[in-house]
Every structure is written in C-alpha cells, then in structure tokens.
Amino acid sequence: MDFAPELITIGQKAKDAARKLAYAGTAAKNKALLAMAEALLNHEQKILEANRKDVEAAIQKGTKKSLVNRLALTSEGIRQMSDALKEVVNLGDPVGEGEFWTRPNGLRIQRTRVPLGVVAMIYEARPNVTVDAAALCLKSGNAVILRGGSEAIESNKILSKVIAGAAESQGMPTACIQLLENTNRQWVQQLMKMNGYVDVIIPRGGAGLIETVVKEATVPVIETGTGVCHAYVDGEADLAKGVSIVFNAKTQKPGVCNALEAVLVNEAVAQEFLPLLGEKFRDYGVEIRGCEKTCAILPYAAKAKEEDWGIEHLDLIISAKVVQGVDEAMDHIYQYGTKHSETIITENYTTAQRFLNEVDAAAVYVNASTRFTDGGRFGFGAEIGISTQKLHARGPMGLQALTTMKYMVYGEDHIVT
C-alpha cells in the first residue's frame, strides 16, 4: 500500500520519539504529566470553545443525544481530566519492573518490562480518551498517534496541542503525542497497515469501529470489545439486591461498554422480581424489551426481537428474558455475550461458583454491578480500554498492559556446547 507522505512523516516522528521516550526516567515523565494537567486548566476556555463547535455541529447533523452527551465537555469535565493526569503520576511506573535469576551454569537472566513502542489509538467522539490515552502512553514510555472521531475534531485538536506542548516543554521527545488531524478515512485505513512504524493499534468504540479495525489492520490489534453485558437473577437471589444492582448497572451511565444490556430472570422468582424491577425502570424512563413470559408479567414491556438479544443498546433500553435456571442463563450468555462483563445475583455459593468458573468473560461478578469493570475501580488508575480478547491483555488495560517483556542476559564467556 502507498502511504500518504504526511502519514509517513507522522509515523517516523512517532518512531523516533518512542526510541527516546523508552529511556525517560519516571521523575521526568511525572513532571511532564503534571505540566499537562496544569495546561488543561490554563486553557479551559479555549477547550470549551472548541468543544462547543463540535457539539453544535453534531446536533445539526441529528446525532443521537447519548452520543452528543459523550462528546460534550464542561468545566467540571476538564477538571476531571486534569485530576486523572495527576492520578497517573501517582501510579507506579511499570517500565523496568521484572525479576532476576541465575542458571546452574552461572548465566544470569533478567526479565524486565519495556514499552511497546508506538501505540495508535483509533476511537470515537470522546475527547477524554485523547487525554487518557496520551497520559497512559507517556507514563508507560510509548509514543502515541491519536485518531479520534471526526465529530470531536476541534476538541481533539486543542486538547492534543495543549498536552503535547506541555509534555515537550518538560523535555519529553517532540512528537511523543500526535493527532491525525486529517479526518479522511483513507488515512485511517493506511494507519492500520503501517507495520514498521506502528507497533500496536487499540480501537475504542462501538462494534462497527472495532470490527473494521480487527478485519482490516495488518498491525497487531488489542481488541477492546463491545459490551453486551448480562445480569442473571437466580432463583435464590436477594431480590432487593437484584433490583438495586440491575438498576445501577443499566442506568448509572447507559452509554458505556460496561453498562447492562440484558437481564435474565429465573422463572422461580420472575413473578415477584420483574414487577419490582419493571416499575423502577418505568419510573426512570427505561424501555423494557422482553420475551413472551416477560411481556405476560409486564404488560407495558415491548416484545423483544431477535436482534435485541445481542446488541449494545447504549441507551435507556434493556432486554429481559425469563429462564429456567443458571444453565439456560449461561447458554444465553454464551450465545449473545461479547465476553466483556457478566454478573449473577444469588445467595447460593455453589451456583455463584459455577457462574464464575463457567462464564467466559473478561470480568465475572457475584452480587455486584457490571459498571465496576473499569481501570480506576479495579485500582489500576486510568485505563486505555477494556480488552475482551485473551492474548496479551484482558479486561481493564492500565499501564502494565502497555508494556511487554525483554530478556537481558549476563554471561562471562558463556558459549553453547
């Protein structure tokens, strides 16, 4: 493939920056992160002004309200981004971590963590990802090429300019943080094939974006999957807990990947549980799309279509199904789940352990909301995404997931015989 000359320049600059950044000390990186945090606050009005342009354009295009809400920034949102950078400062630096051992022949081997190199982030219209990704990549010693959704281009331009300038002012390599300002899709297609310049691509967004990157990229991809997350309310559940957990997992922030999309209810408790949950959902404006049994119990529920079971609603919509027991629930999750986050509400230890061990997902819960699948809530600090694949990284990806292993071997005239 022929690459745009400008894209090659960006790739080469990132490669050169990654080489230098790999050896940057923790103190120097932390100093840069603090400068980035301060710069966001100092440029708040410019950032809000740019974001306003993006929001107005999105509204004029008829963009869904939930997506506009993701796009919009506020003064509080900028302060939160600044605080997130300071939190990354307080996280341990994974670069250089490792272990050391000596073989019987005297050969000394050190396994140590090193940066991946150049990370390309392809993501949708969420300006906070621009800052989070840049911070995590810098702390872990990686250069980053950012390609956000075109709807957030003005926001991303000012954010990347502000934080990159602050990092460089503290001695970080020039071009360690770069934004693809050209929103032409051909550039994205080329970026995904820039082996030799880019070491890994991390897509973050909806199913369409992730599927496109996984299908078309020749550069290695860490797949941050979509979240068709389920809650199974067991026949031995505490129903009050069930209502609380399911309601929180659906409504606390419905437009994110760890929000609940379907509830499966054991038939033994469906007649009692569904009206309790249904009334709370109805009062909050949540649309319920149910199976025949659900609709018989809740006359105001809409009849679910086949496509409702395997979709990320990302809105105040939930699918509901009555099941015979944990086996049918796990079969349903196996068929429609995306291996992201699944939860069971039960007081039965044996059933809980079966669910934990047999459900294949990055995070599996007992009596807790799926909304906890998050780097910060897991104690990793900020996250660059939630991986649903099994190779290299799985679940919330913090700093350590942006490193790999290197072996340093010390000998004294050791030869193989």
Curated annotation (Swiss-Prot):
InterPro entries: Ald_DH/histidinol_DH (IPR016161), Ald_DH_C (IPR016163), Ald_DH_N (IPR016162), Aldehyde_DH_dom (IPR015590), G-glutamylP_reductase_CS (IPR020593), Glu-5-SA_DH (IPR012134), GPR_dom (IPR000965)
Reaction catalysed by this enzyme: L-glutamate 5-semialdehyde + phosphate + NADP(+) = L-glutamyl 5-phosphate + NADPH + H(+)
Family annotation (Pfam families): Aldedh
Biological-process GO terms, alphabetical: L-proline biosynthetic process
Origin: domain of life: Bacteria
Family: Belongs to the gamma-glutamyl phosphate reductase family.
UniProt name for this protein: Gamma-glutamyl phosphate reductase
Organism of origin: Desulfitobacterium hafniense (strain DSM 10664 / DCB-2)
Encoding gene, per UniProt annotation: proA
